[in-house]
């Protein structure tokens, strides 16, 4: 870290996913040496995740920038209902502040998920964090990076139970 900084601007954001892409001008404020040292994080394989897999939360899991937390995956839902889609979600036994921006990486340092507070039942248990798998948000990230907004209908499906079916 060479302690350099540059002004950034919001390129695009998605309210439904809680994701934003910021951009920095490569020609203003960042030296060529600094640009040469910047590497993109690799994406991990969420298909290999299972209960008990160790996870590192980075970003601001404790509500403070540059903090980290450690935990294990306690539950995986590969088709959790969300607005306009099904998402791969996993729940970890670690305290995290999704609103402050937290990400899950595996022990290889690859990105496997983004903390999300959309499910209110998880918010009641501060020792559990819901992460949306990187495979579920990769297209959203690519769209936001290109400056496009995510198309949204605003539909969220629910399971039809016995009582609903026969009422």
Which residue stretches match the model-derived regions?
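Short, conserved beta-turn/loop elements at beta-strand boundaries and strand-helix junctions
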Residues: 13-17, 74-83, 160-163
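Sec-exported extracytoplasmic/periplasmic mature domains
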Residues: 57-60, 78, 109, 142-146
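C-terminal cap/linker of serine protease catalytic domains
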Residues: 8, 111-167
């Amino acid at each position: 870290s060479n302690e350099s900084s540059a002004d950034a601007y919001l390129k695009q954001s998605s309210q439904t996913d809680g994701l934003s892409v910021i951009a920095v001008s490569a020609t203003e404020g960042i030296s060529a040496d600094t640009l040469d040292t910047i590497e993109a994080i690799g994406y991990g394989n969420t298909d290999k995740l299972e209960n008990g897999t160790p996870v590192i939360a980075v970003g601001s899991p404790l509500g403070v920038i540059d903090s980290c937390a450690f935990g294990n995956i306690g539950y995986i839902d590969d088709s959790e209902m969300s607005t306009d889609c099904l998402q791969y979600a996993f729940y970890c036994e670690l305290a995290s502040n999704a609103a402050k921006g937290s990400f899950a990486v595996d022990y290889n340092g690859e990105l496997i998920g983004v903390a999300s507070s959309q499910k209110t039942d998880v918010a009641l248990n501060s020792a559990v964090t819901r992460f949306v798998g990187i495979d579920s948000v990769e297209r959203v990230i690519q769209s936001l990076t290109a400056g496009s907004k995510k198309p949204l209908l605003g539909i969220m499906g629910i399971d039809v139970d016995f009582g609903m079916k026969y009422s």
